[in-house]
Every structure is written in structure tokens, then in C-alpha cells.
Amino acid sequence: MKFEKNTDIFILPDFIRIQLESFHRFIEKGLLEEFQRFPVIRDSSGELSYFLNGKRYKLQEPSFNEQEAIYQASTYSSELYVPAQITHTKSEKTKSEIILIGNIPIMTARGNFIINGASRVIVNQILRSPGLYYGSELDAQANITYSCTFISEWGGRLKLEMDNKRRIWVRLSKKRKIPVLLLLLAMGLNWKDLEKLISRPSLLLSYLSKEKRTPYSPEEAIIELYRHSCSVSGEISFSENIRKELYHKFFKIRCEIGSIGRLNINKKLNLDIPEEERFLVPQDLIAAINSLIEKSFKIVNLDDIDHLKNRRVHLIADMLQSQVRIALNRLKRMIAEVMRGINKRKNLPNPQSLVTPKPLVATFQEFFGSHPLCQFMDQTNPLAEITHKRRISSLGPGGLTQKTATFNVRDIHPSHYGKICPIETPEGQNAGLVSSLAILANINQNGFIESPFLKLHKNEYKQLTGSEHLCSEQEEYYRITTGEHSRETAEKKGKPTPIRYRQEFSATAFHFLHFRDILPIQYFSIATSLIPFLEHDDANRALMGSNMQRQAVPLLRPEKPIVGTGLEGQVALDSAALVLSKIEGKVDFVDGRNINIRSNIVINEFFSFQLINYERSNQNTCLHQKPIVKKDDYVKKGELLADASSTLGGEISLGNNILVAYMPWEGYNFEDAVLINERLIYEDIYTSIHIEKYEIEVNMTSLGPEKITKKIPHLSEYLLRNLDVNGLILLGSWVKTGDVLVGKLTPREPGESLRLPEGRLLHAIFGIKASSFFETCLKVAPGAEGRVIDVRWVESANKLTQKYIKTVNIYILQKRKIQVGDKIAGRHGNKGVISRILPREDMPYIQDGTPIDMVLSPLGVPSRMNLGQIFECLLGLAGESLKKHYRIMPFDERHEREASRKLAFSELYQAKKFTGHSWLFEPDTPGKSQLFDGRTGQTFENAITVGKAYILKLIHQVDDKIHARSTGPYSMVTQQPLGGKARRGGQRMGEMEVWALEGFGAAYTLQELLTRKSDDMKGRNEALGAIVTGNLIPKPNTTPESFKLLMRELRCLCLNIHHCSLFQENLSMKNIEF
């Protein structure tokens, strides 16, 4: 970040630099560190040794680019080569070779990975930082017990507790603990030393029984510690193997604190142990015990576990480095096993023959395929991409879980100020556990989050002396004020300046201050910073607005927002979705796929830019780049050449500016329902493009290969009409539900055809054997239709199984216009579902005759307290009339009271003067106007708020959710229809739905839903037969299957319950068996 002194001019940082810098650190340092740990491997006799020279490792350039990796459904990776040497120590013979260790996935310039053709992102994880932490808790008798916890680099914990009798224990698990004296003696200390080093040594002996008044010897201590930590019973004698096993199972997991933990412990305990010592040493434990004793006798401040100074971010470099460590350990074991079987009398083998790429390839496949923090990239729009890369999660291995996370962990902490956004977090179970980095926040190499501040100079004439990045711990020592305060304003007001100091908010004189903030929005995430008039919105609604902007689908004709915050260009630029010129020159050629530029510096040098053309994203939205330059245009380096699918003119454009009115209309906008004008459909204002991928594999079965062919038996010619002679769909074909995309036949077992009724009939009448293949064609899914835009044959080799897999991928493009049931939203958390589409002539219209585009409910504003939408729509109306765009930083009222209201009204007044339309600003009802009813031509009774709002179309669309079924699968246990569209489920009546029908007295409807349409097996067969034959549907008279299930479960509890039928004629009863 760059600043000019004595000014507020600065350059925003690259929003995805954290990902890129972290991966660069992994390549430059992480790999080297892991290779340096790799030992020289020797065989059991010590004659052969195998050595990897990790300092000279090399990464080859990927064999194909990112686009080819996506097209071929392969991984964008680089081969890792390391010099290796095998030596026979007796004969001193050596063989050296540069060997292939495996492939490492490479991060793209956009900060993501391409794994098997799909874009993936590694989410940063925030965990407790290694080190020492003091705390207190209540025991079973409600007494306060003090504890100190050592957290290792691997997440293991070593907890020391002091109970109410002043005895100190080492906690092994919830139910097991041992005296701390055992641990100290097992670490090599003797009792004489402990008497001198511990401040109150009598506390260590308080646990001993009367019979044993002398402490254990070191060997006895090791045996006792081994017995308790490894849960071993019986007689154990001391041996060196026990010491080694104790080291691996206890000390390595719980006591390896790393360099960060060493710094933390040295600082808290005032020790000067070298940073290279990465394990706990006896001095650490002794100092911690003395400190714990001291804290138990005094009232002192304990550590706040939720403070960011006690939490560290695990970046991409840390996660990938740990995977390389796992892979190299596997490789080490593999080499050692191979070396056991080498005949030493023969020639030395080549180093490559002892190594295979499987350990590294398998480890990364497992990591990218199943690790919870390695996720499919959210590619709904560029904002969703960039937000996903800046996400921080407390979940995952070594972290919290949704069930165990308490309210304190999820809550906003004062140390988050300027580092983690207090607004943007998911709704639901992950609230507070998944967060987003603040807009200017950075993560340093140790994993601590920093925020930049402008340093104030004590000299009266020099206010600023540059900027500094401070982490949470450093911040506590400085007095920091907000960005709008300066020496001049403080002197004019003559009042103390509000500051924050040591997590408290207070006020002091300006000359005592050290730093001030840079931006009023530096505390918020990118998505939250894109909300204009953010300060007028309730935090809950701002959260929804932040999340819903990421769900906006790219539109066919997007518009820039009339009212924005000024960050729209930076977000589009840093998302890497735009195409920028890398050289200065003249545009030589441009079309929809390529832009060629002739260099202005080097003669006859051309630079070609390949554009993304109707590619599918992970969320089935459309990735597309549109050139904005023309032939013979002169461009400079860094100038925009092409827009992406959700950008316009280099700014992020997620929606459209439309004319809205806040008024009720015949109940069609009750609650969150929305009424829209048909203009939005006919003019493609909210039309979006979606691309669906259909995939089918062609396998070699045990009975022979599967066939791709057009000749499919038992299917009509109509369903096969779009196939070419080879059985693949023709490019450009329009397909509907059920149409065949790929004709495929799979071999059937010999004799299986004769077991089928149709096979036996053909054989009996004509003597013809039925086909030895059955149809397994790829068909268009129910409810889908569209145009085929691509057909791809993909041949991929599995490096682990050495098998080649042939796959056919079909891409179908669909244009979706807005319709009833689609979800729309603004940027202020104001969301709704389309309830009705009205003709233009029936919509209310303003005084110049323009019909309203969207009618929103006015009751959705006051109770939700998101007044920012009102300011936005009024200022948008003024901007539309004045042909202006506004870029307003949130918190504009820091300069003046009612600044937002004054700005909106003054701009409406200017629009009234500019256009001559008096209705734009009426002094009696400012911001409101008289509307006319499109059906009658009469005015509405009251003035109505009208304006231009920026409305988004969200990815929650009715085409993806609507579902109907006539027949389908049933659950084997309850015999009720399955749930969900994906499983072809049916409508399921829950308890509350039954109550609703009971309330209306719909007895017959209720009976039908609870019997025939649910789990009455006999009744539904009878109903189907009656429908087919055209007879009346009989009344259900059999027992539903769910009732039978209840009876069986009660019988399992030894309750003898019978189901009886009562006859109306003679009131006789009959037991019904089932």
C-alpha cells in the first residue's frame, strides 16, 4: 500500500495477494524446508544409503495452460524433480540421477487451483496460536481452579491444572490426570534441582500418599507416565523402547511448539531460550508452574482466548507444506522397504527405480478431493470468487465444529476491528465460524492478521509520517483515532478526540495520539464495502446484502450502479476476470475469441490475448469475455481490452438500475412478494445465461467395451433426431427433456436377455434372440432444455491405477428470462420473490407517463431498519435525470449531520431544475411523488416513494427448484415417497400441513394425502388401476405402512399391541394380521 505524505491519496492493495504470496512462499521456502528434513535413508546393514539433495529441486513448467487443463478435465500441475544419490559405503560406488518425485498443483494468476478440470480454492484456517495460555474455570464444587495450557504446533495440548487443594496436575484427557512431578522427573530433572527452582516445592509433594514420602526416580517416572499416557496396565519394566514410544506418542504431539510458540512462551515467561529450540524444555515447565502458583495466590488478568493475538491463520503455504511432509514420510518408508530387498552384490540400482510419484500424487489428490477447507470455487460472479479467496474459517481439522463452538467464539471481538469484517458471515450454523478479511487487512508470515494505519507526527505542522501495519498485540500499546479527525478539527471543536486504546473506547487530546485510520470502510469486507449508505442499514440486513451480492447471476445486459461506493473498479480488476493489455501498441485484430496487439516498441512484435468464450462455471453460470476495443485503437500498457460476464467498463456490474415504487398493490407484494413489469422480460433486462454440463463415461466392462452408436433399440426416432452418425449430439441442436445426447449401449450377460419376458416371447415366436446390449444413453434431464454449444471427448489417465478413461462432455446453454418464482434482491438485504408479472399498461406510472418497473412493499423497510435502500433509490432517480453516477464512501455523516438526506434532496432539486419536472422534488413531500393507476388512470390517494434502485437477480431460480411427479421411488422402510428433486421425490405432508387441512375441515383431501398418496401400498395400486380403467377411485380400507411400522417398533419393546377392525353392522371386532 502506498501513501503520499500529508494527503489521503493511497493505492488499495491487491485483494488476492495473500493467496498468491502464500503459494509463492510455499514454492520458495516450504518445499526447501521439507527436503532439508528428509533424512539420509540407510538399509539395515548400513551398507547402502539414499540421499535427496532438496536444495537443488526443480519445478518444470506445466505441460499445458489453464484453459487446456479445464478443457481436458485434468489437473494444472508441475512436475517436481530432485537430484538423488545412492551410495554403497564399502565400495564407495555412487549413482546420481535427477528423479521425478511427483506433480504439485500450481496456483493460477487468479489465486485458485484447477483440479480435474474444476476450479478449487483453499480457504485459510484460523486456529489457536502455539504457545502458553492461562485460564480459570469452575470445578464440580463451584471452586475456581487455575490452569495453564501449552498448545503445540500440531494442535496437541499439555494442560497444567491447580485444584482447590493447591495440587498441580497434568491433564491427559477429560477423565485422566497425573501429578506434574511425574512429568518433570520424566524430563530428566531430579528432586534436589526442583526444590531450588520451584517457588513452593511443597505443592509438588502434596499428592503423595503417607506410605510414599519420597519422589519417584526418573525411570519410575517414565514408566508411570507411559502407563497413564498410553493406557497400559500390568507390570512394566524400564527400557529404551518405552522412552522412544513415550517421545512419539506424548512429547512430539504435545510438546513441539515451533518457532511461533517459542516466541510466545519466551515473552510470557521472560525466558531467553533460543528460537531454534522448538520443543518444550524443563525451564518452560518450571517457569509456567511458578507463574501458575503466583496467579493462584493473586488476582491477575488471565489470557483472552478469543483475542486475535492468541489466534493464528494457517495459510495455503502451511497446508501444502504439511501435505508435502506427509508425502515425503510415505516416500521414506517406501524407499526403506525397497532397499531391504536390494541385492548388494549386483550393480547399484538407479535412484529413480526406488521412487515412484504415487505418494506425492496420492497425497495431493486426497487433500484436494476430500479436505473440508479445499472447496469448489464459488464462480457465480467475480465478487463471489474474490470473497471466497479471502475467507477465513475456524472449522476443519484441528479447529472447531458447529456443535462445540460456543457463543463467545462466534461473537465479534474488539480485536477484530480493522482485521475481520464484523458484518459478513454465513447465516445459520456457521455464523461467526466463517468470516471474511477486512478490506485492507494483511496476514504476515507468522500468520497474524495486520491492519494498516497512518502514523501521526508530534510536530504541529507535520501530521502524517507514512503508514504502518499493526497486529492486534501491537495495537494495544497505541492510541488510535478514526480517519476524519485531524489536528485542525480537534483545535476548532476544542473537545477531546475519540480514540480506542487497549480495547476500550475513550477520548483524549489530539497530541497524545499515535495513529489514525485510513478509510472509513477499512473495518469491513469487500462485499460489505460495496453497499452504499451502509451506515443507515441494520447489521443483520447488511449481512444479508453482503451475502446476496455473491449470489447474483451474470446478466445478458448488466448496468453499472448509479449509486456506488467507488470500489467497483478495484473489485473487478483484482478478480482477474478482466483482460488488460500487457504492452503498449495498436490493436491489429479483434473478434469474439482473440485480440492481437502490434507492439509500439519492438517492430513486428505481436501479442495475442485469448478470450474466454461461453465457458461453464462451477455454479453453471456463464463465463464470457467481451472485447471493448476496436481495430486500429491505440492502447497503453494496463489498459482494459475486454470485459467479463459481470463487469461493464472495468467496473463490477451485478444488476440493473430500475424504476421502483414502495406501495401496496392488490396484495401481490404482501410480505416479500414483488410485482414486476413485463418490460423486464421483453427487453431482456434480467435475462441470464446458464450452461449445464452432461457427462457420460465409456468404459471397458468385463463383457466387452460399451458402444457409442445412433442405432438404439426401443427408442423412437424423434428422441434420436439430433444425433450424428456416430451417436453424438450435433452442435447447435435445440434439445428438450428426454432427448438423447449420446447413444450408448452396454453389454449384457449371455442368457440374461432370455430371462426377460420380451426376450422369451421373441425367441418363442420368431426364434430371434434379444439384443445382447441394453440402452444406457445420456438424456436431457427433466425440466431442462437449451442449445448444445460444445461436445468434448476427454481421454484422461489415472496416474494411480494407470487406466485410461474416455468421457463425453456435452454443454447445453440456456437463456433464462425472469419469471414468477425467481428471487431478486437489492444491496441492503431487501429480498423478495416475483409473485406476478403485469402488462406495462396496468402498472402504476409516474407523472411523465413512465410505468414503474417493480413494486415493493413499504412495510419491508421500517421493521427491518435498512433505510439505505431509500437513500439509494432517491439518489438514483436524481442521477438518472442528471446523467450522473455517484460514488459515495459509506459513513458520509462523519462530516455533517443528515449528510445523506441533504445530498439526496439537493440532487433531486438539481434534477428538478435541470429537467423542468416539478414532481422530482416537491417541497411538501420531498422524495415522494403522485402516481397514477395504470388500470384506471386515476391518481393514488397518497404520494409514493419512487426511485431508481439497483436490483440483482439471484441464483435461486424457480427453474432449478420446481418439481412434479406422478410416479416415483418409495422408501423401503416407511413406503412413503422420497424427498427432494434430485431423488424424484414426492410431496410430503408434515405435522403442520396436516393441522392446516384439519383447520379447514378438508377431511377427504387429508385422507387421500395420508393414505393413497403416501404409504397405503394396496390403496395406491387400486387407485392407479382405477385411473387407467376410468373407474371411480375406491375408498382406502387398508392399513398404512407407517402405522404397521409403529406397531412393529412397539412390539420390539415387548408391548403386545394388535390392530383391529370394527364392523359397523354388529360392532364385532376382527384382528388384522400384518
Curated annotation (Swiss-Prot):
Its EC number is 2.7.7.6. Pfam families: RNA_pol_Rpb2_1, RNA_pol_Rpb2_2, RNA_pol_Rpb2_3, RNA_pol_Rpb2_6, RNA_pol_Rpb2_7. The keyword Plastid applies. GO terms for biological process: DNA-templated transcription. Its main location: plastid. It comes from the Eukaryota. PANTHER family: DNA-DIRECTED RNA POLYMERASE I SUBUNIT 2 (PTHR20856). DNA-dependent RNA polymerase catalyzes the transcription of DNA into RNA using the four ribonucleoside triphosphates as substrates. This is DNA-directed RNA polymerase subunit beta. It comes from Chara vulgaris (Common stonewort).
